[in-house]
Each structure stands twice: as structure tokens, then as C-alpha cells.
Amino acid sequence: SYGLIDEEGMLVNTSNRRHNLNLNLDTDLNKWLKMGVTFRGDLSKRGQTENFNVAAEARPDLPCYNEDGSYYVHKYMYQGEERFESNPMIEAKERDNVNQDLGANITSYLVSRPFGGLSLRLQYSYNYKQSKGRDFYPSMTLYGSGGYKGQKGQLTNTERLSENQELMGQIMYGKRIKKHNFDITMVGTLTDSKNSYASMTFADFPDDKTQTSIWQGVTYKDQMGYDKGALLLSYVARANYSFNDRYLLTVSWRADGSSRFSPDNRWSYFPSLAVAYNLTEEKFLRHNKVINFLKLRASVGKVGMGYVDEYGWRTLYDATEYLDQPAIVPGSMGNNNLKWEGTVSYELGLDYGFFKNNRISGTLEFYKKKTKDLLYRYTLSPGIGLPSANVNFAAIENRGIDFDINAKIINTRNLSWSFSFNISKNLNKVTGLDSKYVSSPGSSALNNTVIEEGKSVGLFYGYKSDGIFQNWEEIEACEALNPDMPYQQKFSSDVLSPGDIKLLDLSNDGYVNFTANNYEDKTVLGSSLPDFSGGFSTRLTYKGFTFSMSGTFSYGNMKSWDAEGRQFQFNAARPKNLLDIALKRWTPENPTNDYPKIRLNGTNYGMTDFWLHDASYLKINNISLTYQLPANWLRRTGFID
């Protein structure tokens, strides 16, 4: 099959053109041997722009064009220097930002069934993806001109390449002996992944239209890239047994070896055990008119996560330059002790169906998951001289319940109505932290969140607020608490004034401490995880009409609206348009506690509970109404049989 998509975007100079081709071949070579080949390929070209943010922040009182039709460029002075405001129309129409993607996937297999119950499968797959990007800013744009300082255009070329090969061998054997049914599966897989990236930027081209290839740029600006690869070898064995379709048992064992870890920690092993009891097959329920299906199940097993950087356990170095001299600098610290992250899961579930044809059905499941050796890329202290390292630094426990129900409320020939509902609740707790990677006893601060032993993950961490300073008297009262320290000063130029957010001194030492790695005045502000979440859907059909609706909900989580805080930070070097909430800011004429005043810098923007909001929601994702034409009408057209 062949498909073509050709569409223009809603934004100026955006488009998407994509070709895709699918080929399938399956054939029986003889009675016991079968082969097949599948090919999927796609070729796409996308014209794109990052102009939306530029347009949203552009001053609405400035024109896009001069009276003669040329582009308008707004000039202004900042600290004695002439600067220019970006014109979003120039960026949209003149910037040449195109990505071309080429992808191909080939899968071939051989299946042999030499005798009853035995199946052998050999499969090879190859996945290739290449992405080339060209991003050219002509000299008339703000970026391409170097801020209108005479630069003659700027071009960045990028290329990404990924190749993934997988060889899989599988043996399956199954047999039924009277009431006993069992099957055994063994799988071996070798996966080879390669990824590369290259980017190069040059400036100053002969013109903006024809001589704009990367080699025609005169001034070198920047380059970067990488070439990575990883191998994964996996073995899986699984056995299923059932007696009279009533008692079920599954045992599995998996071994994974990854080159992403050091030789001493390359392999990890993941066993599992699951049992189930189908009560419906018991005589006392076989003819029950209320309980149509009932199954109890329980399982315990271990799964692993080994996705870290391809050379995550090694110390890496980066190539750079300083004063036009080449140099090699440390990139990340190696860790020979880095190992697989492992999660042991315990699950107990009930599958049910009531009344004829499972008029009401669903599941109820309880689970407990214990994760050890949590993988994380840890930011190191600046004094070490290396930016980061991959580490195993935490243990986490999750406990929860999942419930879903499906009901066929009405089910007649012309009218049917069904409804589905699900809800989940999860509780988690940090049960351990590696002492080498904690910032204070028992906790580790990660930007605006904190991981603390004994508490949940996803906790916002920062300063508590107490409204807004309304007058100088309130400020003077706080400054008097500690004559040796300013009450609330993040920067040396930061001086409190009416309209600023008031932060609380939780340590009671008379001032709010902003020193790095000082947590005396910081506290947990809320959680990004909900108390519970779920979804629902309904479908109503009457003759040829069908109405359907689906939605999701979440309750109890908080969200930090970063963009909201930025509306009250003034950037004199680059004035921009703001959201209308800035009109509700504090002023002497509007002494509100809703929003602070706009200021050049200070503590009004940052992680405080002032910018945290209740993120509970109820969302309707989809509503549709369709009508299906009667089949006899369509037969009269001659298009269908």
C-alpha cells in the first residue's frame, strides 16, 4: 500500500508532506516451513517554525510592515546601546527551517512446525531512520544579522542517524493431555543500537537566496555531535500450565546483559510467578445466573530498567576550543558500580462478570511495587570539576489499587447503551537514599523538587509565602527581626519594596536564607502526584446513529505554572508582551494580594507556593456523533457488494 499526506500548517511557512509505503509477503515453502517479509518505509519533509512564541510575546502596537511594504524593524536604546525588536513576520516568512526524514523498517522471519506442538521461529529486523535539518536565518532577520550588526545570515545544519538491528530465536512447545494443558517458550534476542548526531553552524554568506550551502559560510560559529552504540543480549524462558481451565500457573525467568553497564554489573536476572483460580469452572458456579465469570489471580515478579546513556558507566570527555585552541575537557564522571534498576511487584486481582454475556464486567487489583537502585543522572558539586554522573541512589515503594467497571446498560436490537469507568489510587514512599548523593540528612534536592526518605516522590520544594507587602511599615517590621541581615535578599541589588511577595522565615533566625544548599527556610509545598485519577467513556447507539464520549479526571495534585511567574519579571534588555494577568498586578492604586508588582529582578519569581495551583481537573477528551448508512442503500450505488 502507498499513502501520501500533503498539508499546510496553520502557522505561516509551515507544512508537512509525507510518503509511506507498506509491503507484505507471506508464503508457505512447504507443509512445515513458512517465511515472510515486511517492509515499511516513509519519507517526509516538514517546514516548521518556532514563531509562535515570538508572535505571542511581540508588542501588539508595532506594525509588521512599513508603508512601502518593507518589513518594519523596531529600534530602542538599552544602556546606551541600540537594540532591535524581533518582527515575527520576518521570522515566519524569511526563515528557511526544513527537516527531511527517511525511515525504513524490514522484518523477515522463518517459522517451522516439524511436528505437532513444536514451533521454531527465527526473525531478523532492521530499523533505519535518518533526519536532516536545515535552519537558515537570512541577513534581514534579527538572528541572522547578529542583532542587526552586519552579519550576513546564519545557517545550522543537523543530521541524526539511528540504526537498530535485532536477531531473535524462539522455541515454543505446547501439549494437552486430558485435563492438563501446558506450553513452554524460550526466546533469545540480540539487539544492536547505533545513534549519531552532528550539527554545524556557519555565518556570513554571499547572499540570502542561492549561495547558502554550509560550505559557503565564511565565519565558523559552532559544531557538536556524538556517535554512540549499545548491545543488549536477552534470554527468556516461560512455562504455562492449566488444569481443567480452572487452575493456572505461569513461571518465567529472564536474563538481560547490557553494554550500558560495567562488565561486573552487566547482567541482571528477573524471575516471576503467577497463579490464577477460575472459579467459574467450579460446579457450584457453572450454572449461576448472576455470576457469569469470576477469576482470582496473584503474581510476584521482578522487572528491570537499564536505560542509561550508552557509555553511562565510563568517564567521558568532550572536545572543545578556547581562544581558537583545541581542547579535551571532562564531560561526565564514570561509575563502575552502576547497575540495573530493579522493581519487585506483588499483585492480587479479581476479574468479574455478572449476568448473561457479562452484562457487568471489570477488574479489581491491588499492587505493591518495591524499586531498588533507582537510576538517576546526578548533578555533581562544582568543586569536583565534572558536571554529572549516572548513579543508583534511591529505593521507592508504590502501593495502590486499580478498579474498572464496564456495563451494558441497554442492549436491544435497535438501542444499546454502554458505560465504562476506571479509577486508580497510588501511594508511594522513598524507602532509602544513598548517603553519597543527599544534600541534607535523609533528603536530596533536585531543582524545585525534593526526594526525602519516608515521604512521597514528586514533592515541590521551596519557600512559603504570606501574601504581598502592602506598605513600608510591613517591610520595616521584618527588617527589624535581624539587624545584621536583610530580611529577604536573593541578589545584592535586590531591595524589598511594597508589592513584593512576602516569604516566611521558617528557621526563625530573622531572615530568609537564599544560600545554595541551605534548606532551613525551604519546605515541602505540595505534591505533583494526584490523590486519585481515572477515566470514563460511554456509547449510545440507536439504529444508525451512534453517540460516544470519553474523558479523564485527576484530583489532588499541584502544578507550578512557570509562565505565570515570568509575567511579573521585567526584562529591560528585551521588552515583550505579557499575559493579561499582568494587568491585575499590585500597584499603589490596586493594593492586591493576588499578584505582585512587576520588577526587574528579585525573589518574586521562583519556587514558592505563590505560583503553585491546584491541578485537579475533569476533561472531556472526545465527543462524536456518527450515522451509518444502511447497507442496502450502499449496495444500490454499486460500490459495495
Language-model features: where?
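Conserved small-residue
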Residues: 391, 408-526
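Extracellular/periplasmic, surface-exposed regions of secreted and cell-surface proteins
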Residues: 18, 24-33, 38-43, 81-137, ...
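Solvent-exposed loop segments that connect transmembrane elements
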Residues: 64, 138-154, 319-330, 380-389, ...
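Glycine-rich, aromatic-lined ligand/substrate-binding cores of catalytic
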Residues: 525-561
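Periplasmic-side early beta-strands and strand-to-turn transitions of outer-membrane beta-barrels
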Residues: 1-16, 47-51
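Acidic, glycine-rich flexible loop segments
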Residues: 54-89
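C-terminal extracellular loops and terminal segments
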Residues: 393-397, 439-460, 519, 525-539, ...
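Extracytoplasmic gating/loop element in the C-terminal half of outer-membrane beta-barrel translocons
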Residues: 258, 554-639
